[in-house]
């Protein structure tokens, strides 16, 4: 399969298109044919490994995972033996900020992590680009004791996290 690969940190110039081995799902994973993947702020930070502290989890001198990408949408093409939440043919989207390897034709993903069935009215491009902001916004909102009718100021509501926060807060009644 084809994938975007990097073996050192840096600018987008370090990215290369290469043939790599197609992954196989373990018993609790699914294999997804990637139809759309975005480039978001997490991907840019991972590519450069900045701030430097990121290198303690991503690889001190070079990336541990050679295929970048954190966000995707696609089709389930194979499921591990222990997976009962997804089936072949499901349209799914997901996000993992620890480098998911979504810049490839196929990826494996744990069935019990940040993955869901796509809403019917979403296309692959919409689903593949909407998750990162919502992931962080939901995480922040979930940490506060939000009450229905409470007024909330979202500082920076024009980016992906802020716009997702506004929508989620409205959904939760703030």
Region annotations inferred by a language model:
Residues 1, 90, 147-151:
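Nucleotide donor/acceptor-binding cores
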Residues 44-54:
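Short Gly/aromatic-enriched secondary-structure transition segments
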Residues 10-17, 41-42:
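Short N-terminal binding/cap micro-motifs at the start of the first secondary-structure element
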Residues 35-39, 113-144:
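Extended, non-globular alpha-helical segments
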Residues 3, 34, 76, 107, ...:
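Terminal peptide-recognition signature
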Residues 128-174:
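Mid-domain Rossmann-like dinucleotide-binding core that forms the NAD(H)/NADP(H) cofactor-binding site
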Residues 98-111:
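A structural motif shared across PLP-dependent enzymes of the aminotransferase-like
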Residues 21-38, 52-99:
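Glycine-rich beta-strand-centered segment in the early N-terminal region that forms part
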């Amino acid at each position: 399969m084809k994938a975007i690969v990097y073996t050192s940190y840096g600018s987008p110039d370090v990215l290369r298109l290469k043939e790599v081995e197609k992954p196989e799902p373990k018993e609790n994973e699914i294999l997804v044919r990637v139809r759309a993947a975005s480039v978001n702020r997490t991907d840019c930070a991972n590519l450069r490994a900045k701030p430097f502290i990121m290198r303690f989890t991503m690889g001190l001198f070079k990336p541990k995972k050679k295929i970048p990408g954190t966000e995707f949408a696609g089709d389930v093409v194979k499921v591990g033996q222990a997976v009962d939440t997804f089936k072949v043919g499901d349209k799914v989207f997901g996000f993992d900020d620890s480098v998911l390897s979504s810049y490839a034709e196929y990826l494996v993903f744990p069935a019990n992590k940040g993955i869901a069935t796509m809403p019917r009215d979403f296309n692959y491009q919409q689903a593949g680009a909407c998750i990162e902001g919502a992931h962080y916004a939901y995480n922040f909102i979930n940490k506060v004791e939000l009450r229905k009718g409470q007024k909330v100021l979202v500082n920076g509501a024009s980016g992906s996290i802020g716009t997702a926060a506004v929508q989620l807060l409205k959904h939760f009644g703030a």
